[in-house]
Curated annotation (Swiss-Prot):
Pfam families for this protein: Matrix_Paramyxo_C, Matrix_Paramyxo_N
GO biological process, one term: virion assembly
InterPro entries (alphabetical): Matrix_C (IPR042539), Matrix_N (IPR042540), Matrix_Paramyxo_C (IPR055413), Matrix_Paramyxo_N (IPR000982)
Name of encoding gene: M
UniProt keyword Zinc, yes or no: no
Protein name: Matrix protein
Amino acid sequence: MAGSQIKVPLPKPPDSDSQRLNAFPVIMAQEGKGRLLRQIRLRKILSGDPSDQQITFVNTYGFIRATPETSEFISESSQQEVTPVVTACMLSFGAGPVLEDPQHMLKALDQTDIRVRKTASDKEQILFEINRIPNLFRHHQISADHLIQASSDKYVKAPAKLIAGVNYIYCVTFLSVTVCSASLKFRVARPLLAARSRLVRAVQMEVLLRVTCKKDSQMAKSMLNDPDGEGCIASVWFHLCNLCKGRNKLRSYDENYFASKCRKMNLTVSIGDMWGPTILVHAGGHIPTTAKPFFNSRGWVCHPIHQSSPSLAKTLWSSGCEIKAASAILQGSDYASLAKTDDIIYSKIKVDKDAANYKGVSWSPFRKSASMSNL
């Protein structure tokens, strides 16, 4: 069994407003009872290289409703029927060119027609049928996808509420636009992340997030108490890269060896809203040969939180968060080695003070006080 862990203290980065990505405020329309106003959030995450092309990631949050039934006769005085909210939902429009006019983006959402269906293979899935999107987003990734299939627990807050025999539609309410450098758009192929071998050591990354929530809230029960009393602490892990096992029998491959490798890589971690809440890692130094497939040519990699922890990602839809700390953990790659060796932890991962916070949407699909019947 694995023994005790060795941990190097990490000094807390200086506080900064740019570390926070606050929640969308709840703003109700005056003319409509209980109707939430559509909102847009803009943020920039740049690589620092002036030659790097800028793009925009568009991510949407909203609600799934049953499609209204049509009657035989409709007059011009008939009010459009709005069905109750079934559950909250997230759908990424993907990357595309820079968009300039926020108000135009919000108005264009009226042209969106996205149908939602439930299906299953080895697990439950959600199928988004893209019937119509605004011309404004015609150069974004979603314009090339007529059908988007995804795991239901990653994109729908409460998939158990979707039942057979009902037609559903996705209504976008919140638009999150991230202007970023094109070099940031890199994710590791899933087969590479899942592969394990006795020939390498695995480097995992743990990011501790301070989530904005009340200690007596329902979500706080699944998290750790924040010793600073500023929210709750959630831990999320993902596979960062692999390191080749050293063959020099006279050398000690201990925490000092691992710390040296991490220092040379010069790792920095930040958070943004790209494929939903996403952890970004930048290796600004030397990347070992075995680790290079896990980063792009400029040393960047993105890890959407919903791939590692769908439940935490859905919590962040409606709650802001801040990166409290980040650590790299050296483990055996194959399970036999993992069970027999101790974790070696390197905690001196830099936190980008300008991009260490995530602003969620300050609504809750479980809060009964907010009526959304005519959104």
